[in-house]
């Protein structure tokens, strides 16, 4: 799977074996700003400050 791994939408990388999810972390406030992106084996848990969304198709994050 290929996932974006920077805040720039045109940069991505091929994920290592076993990491079959892409994630995007978004700050919940003040403006729902994208915080980080990358590959993961399991979806990171959201917190009070950051909401994580995961997907399993190329460049979906």
From Swiss-Prot:
Main location as per UniProt: secreted
Protein name: Cytotoxin homolog 2
Misc note: These two sequences have Gly and Leu at positions 25 and 27, respectively, instead of 2 Met that are found in most cytotoxins. The low toxicity of these 2 proteins may possibly be correlated with these changes.
Keywords, sorted A to Z: Disulfide bond, Membrane, Secreted, Target cell membrane, Target membrane, Toxin
Top-level taxon of the source organism: Eukaryota
Job of this protein: Has low cytotoxic activity.
Localization in the cell: Secreted; Target cell membrane
Disulfide cross-links: 3-22, 15-39, 43-54, 55-60
Pfam family for this entry, one: Toxin_cobra-type
Similarity remark: Belongs to the three-finger toxin family. Short-chain subfamily. Orphan group XV sub-subfamily.
Disulfide bond listed as a keyword: yes
GO cellular component, one term: membrane
GO molecular function: toxin activity
PROSITE patterns recorded: SNAKE_TOXIN
Gene3D superfamilies in UniProt: CD59
């Amino acid at each position: 799977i290929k996932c974006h791994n920077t805040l720039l939408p045109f940069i991505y990388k091929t994920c290592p074996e076993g990491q079959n999810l892409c994630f995007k972390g978004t700050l919940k406030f003040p403006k729902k700003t994208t915080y980080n992106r990358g590959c993961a084996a399991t979806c990171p848990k959201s917190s009070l400050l950051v909401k994580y969304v995961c997907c399993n198709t190329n460049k979906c994050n």
